[in-house]
Amino acid sequence: MIMKMNLYCILCLFLTVFSSACGNEKIDGNKTKQVTLTITPSDEIIVEGKGGSVSFTVTPSDPTVALKYVPSVEWVKATSGTKETLWNIATNTSKLSREGYIYILDNASLVQLGKITIIQKSTDGEIQENPTVSFNEADVPIFIPFAGNSYMTTPPASSEIDLYTGKFKDTWMDKTIVSSTYFHVGETGNMNLAVVGSNETGNSIVRFKIRDKTYDVTISGPTSKIYGIATIPIKKSGYIRVDMQGVSRSGKSFGDVTGFRIGGQATMGDNHFVTEEKMVEDKLNCYFFRRGASVHWGYTMPEANVEYFYNEVLVTEENVRNSSYYMMNGFSEGYMGIQQTSSGEHTILFSVWSPYSTDNPSDIPEDKRVKLLRKGKNVTVGEFGNEGSGGQSWLHCGWKAGTVYKALVQVKPDGNGNTIYTAYFYADNEWKLIASFLRPDTNTWYKGAHSFLENFDPVNSIYTRSVLYRNQWVRLASGDWKEITTAKFTCDNTGIQGLRYDYSGSVDEKNCGFVLKSFGFSDDHTEYGKIFTRPSSGTAPDIDFKRLENIPSVE
């Protein structure tokens, strides 16, 4: 979802957005002047782990300015009955140092004029290079759920995270595993980052890694709390990856992390991630959102009866991943393309939906079933469900990365109120028949020509894939060939809602083709509905259609 800062969030972030320099402008009528602060003994105070009182003196350059002091953390509190410049620092029980702030505001305008930084040592009397910072909800108003946005990256594509809930399947005890949470921020500037969690079994130290820097945070107690991680400078808008790994624990678990919170200037644009609201709309949403956005080319067809659609595909080695469908020849009633299954098998899939609407193939009446007319060698035929139902076939031919493959699909009415769909695949220097299906109660030519790129297993969504579709042609019922050089880029609902932003389309001019790219949390993005035109190859396919029709069916 596009998470744009609303007015409330902007007000909440008021304290952190303005410069932390000790000075700002005070507007009085038509006069504008700079208000600076003199802070003694220093605007940075180091406190021992046992805590105690700290005091300071703040003098504004304009004596008429009344000051207001606001602490950013619960462990820094004003001492009751004394001046606002005398504060009590609670004992730090963690082995990690921590950092908090006292913001100094103009009492009338609430403009931030400066701040005092409080750095408290750990129980061992040390200050880490990246001390633990503390934020309140105003500092980090945007919540990013762990579920829906997190994946196992060590070991990669492992099963510790449940496919449907997006949470750890079991108690988090293993310190060798690493989960990674991804989200997209739309602006540059500082980003406050915090984790939300609890640990009812004791205390734990959890390590977070962001852009090659690590931060250790102590999580303790049964009540969920906001634990500050760091303020991170963001120099380029795009995806942020937060790695999480357990370091040590006193109890059974490293704790329960429900998500992260972000704030600051970098988060004040369009942010993209899977939200809690979207996941609760349907119990399957988390599963589908974690798969990433499927992306499509919708080809511009001529105003005539189209009988055949021809397409070519190229998948290079670095883009071959399990659970990928590089669909080549889609039509209004089905599709055909190359696949790498979840187990790594390379197949060619051809499917035709039944005109009877159901997700259960056994519910289809006999007169509404898609019927097999022919099938080729090394082809398996069956039924499918869960996305409509119908006839399905697989050619087992072991396609190879880096090789250009050709596909041809025929859609033709039989004159009796039905339509016949036939798919061919060119490999090993010959055209191979996949299957021919009859779809009842259908009278149509080839319509809705499209291609798409799909990841069908959430664990593999962390890997970027791209595919080249090139040299598209259609053959009309009249026998004439027409080249297809225009296509519209679209994506599925995960992309439309802005839950994922890592998808794009482009033209490969050298190869006269269209490129689809998605997954992997890249920063490449294309606007939904953008029209692309590729260069013309000018050379129609050379196909012996009589020979195709005479390929024998294999029982």
Residue spans for each PLM region:
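Surface-exposed binding patches on compact interaction domains or structured appendages
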Residues: 36-41, 56-87
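Short, exposed coil/turn segments at beta-strand boundaries within extracellular/luminal domains
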Residues: 107-114, 251-254
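Sec-dependent signal peptide recognition
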Residues: 4-12
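Short, solvent-exposed loop/linker segments at the N-terminal edge
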Residues: 45-50
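Surface-exposed, short loops/turns at beta-strand junctions within beta-sandwich domains
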Residues: 90-97, 233-236
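Extracytoplasmic
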Residues: 77, 123-398, 406-413, 417-555
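A short beta-strand micro-motif common to beta-rich folds, especially ectodomain repeats
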Residues: 97-108
